[in-house]
Swiss-Prot record:
Entry's Gene Ontology BP terms: translation
Family: Belongs to the universal ribosomal protein uS10 family.
Quaternary structure note: Part of the 30S ribosomal subunit.
Function: Involved in the binding of tRNA to the ribosomes.
SMART domains the record matches: Ribosomal_S10
PROSITE patterns: RIBOSOMAL_S10
Top-rank taxon, per record: Bacteria
Originating species: Frankia alni (strain DSM 45986 / CECT 9034 / ACN14a)
The encoding gene: rpsJ
Protein name per the record: Small ribosomal subunit protein uS10
Cellular component, GO, one term: ribonucleoprotein complex
InterPro entries: Ribosomal_uS10 (IPR001848), Ribosomal_uS10_CS (IPR018268), Ribosomal_uS10_dom (IPR027486), Ribosomal_uS10_dom_sf (IPR036838)
Signal peptide location: none
Amino acid sequence: MAAQKIRIRLKAYDHEVIDSSARKIVETVTRTGAQVAGPVPLPTEKNIYCVIRSPHKYKDSREHFEMRTHKRLIDILDPTPKTVDSLMRLDLPAGVDIEIKL
């Protein structure tokens, strides 16, 4: 029988917030006795938006804005019921998007 694995994918706009959240998850999982692989930094997604500075004309004058999405991947190998329960109770910041796959 194959070993069970939980894959957690984190996304955030601020790299400090996502790193602290990943650290919290890793500490919680290691306390419960499961093995952790990660956090693995995935490529940062960079969206660039080009906007005309003037409200009417002057198309040559433009301004660029960028939005970076940082991503991390954490694998939990052989999770126990205690591990799953502690992950459900974990309090993480609102700026972090969490995707969990079993």
